[in-house]
Design a protein with these regions (language model features):
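Active-site HxH/HxHxD metal-binding segment of metal-dependent hydrolases
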Residues: 1-41
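Short active-site oxyanion
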Residues: 7-12, 73-74, 183-184
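Active-site metal-binding loops of divalent metal-dependent hydrolases
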Residues: 17, 55-58, 78-80, 101-103, ...
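Short, charged, surface-exposed secondary-structure boundary motifs
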Residues: 22-25, 45-47, 62-63, 107-110
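Core dinuclear metal-dependent hydrolase active-site scaffold
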Residues: 38-96, 196
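Cap/insert and terminal regions of metallo-dependent hydrolase folds
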Residues: 85-186
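Short, basic/aromatic-enriched C-terminal tail that caps enzymatic domains
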Residues: 183-196
Length: 196
């Protein structure tokens, strides 16, 4: 972010705690390009309204966002160890939602990570599993709106796109949520921008 800001003279937006945590690693940023967005707030940027909300993760002031434009909205919620009421309240009206589907629990348990990292990933301030992502989508779908859901932040070590998708589909099928009719489900590519 620091390199982009310096090269293209663009601002960096972050809440105060996140800014303080990353300030040294960014390098020198022009004062006018330092933009503090208070936690749990809404700000307008041109014709976009951007709302931040807390996400339970073991990083400094982890945050998700909902962006509204001309009556439409999109949300991003990653780095969430637990799907909370605050997250649901902030994303349930969005037409497009990028939601974390980070790992398969068994792959974490039997994978190469050291014990402490496994415990961290699986904790309530770690990352959302594929099954918990499916359960979160069930909660989102209780709000009667056709949505596009993008599964994102898939672990390279503890997940496989097909496994993430199938785990979520299994949960949705168990709750009689019809993919294609009730919602569109996509996977974000790990290494390139989505065409969604």
């Amino acid at each position: 972010a620091g390199i982009l800001s310096r090269k293209f003279n663009i601002p960096i937006y972050a809440n105060e705690l996140t800014w303080k945590a990353m300030e040294k690693s960014l390098g020198k940023i022009k004062e006018e390009n330092i933009k503090i967005m208070p936690k749990r707030s809404t700000m307008s940027l041109n014709d976009l309204d951007i709302t931040s909300f807390n996400t339970p993760h073991d990083s400094v002031a982890s945050t998700g966002y909902t962006i509204k434009h001309k009556g439409k909205s999109a949300s991003i919620a990653t780095d969430i160890g637990t799907f909370t009421e605050e997250i649901l309240r902030n994303i349930r009206e969005s037409e497009v939602i990028l939601l974390e589907s980070n790992h398969d629990v068994q792959m974490v348990k039997f994978g190469p990570y050291p014990y402490e990292l496994k415990r961290r990933v699986l904790s309530e301030v770690g990352h959302l599993s594929n099954e918990d992502c499916g359960k979160a989508i069930v909660d989102i779908m209780k709000h009667d709106k056709h949505r596009k859901i993008i599964l994102g932040h898939l672990s390279n070590t503890n997940n496989v796109p097909e496994l993430a998708e199938q785990a979520v589909i299994n949960v949705l099928n168990a709750h009689k949520i019809n993919i294609g009719k009730d919602l569109e489900l996509k996977l974000a590519d790990r290494h390139k921008p989505s065409s969604y």
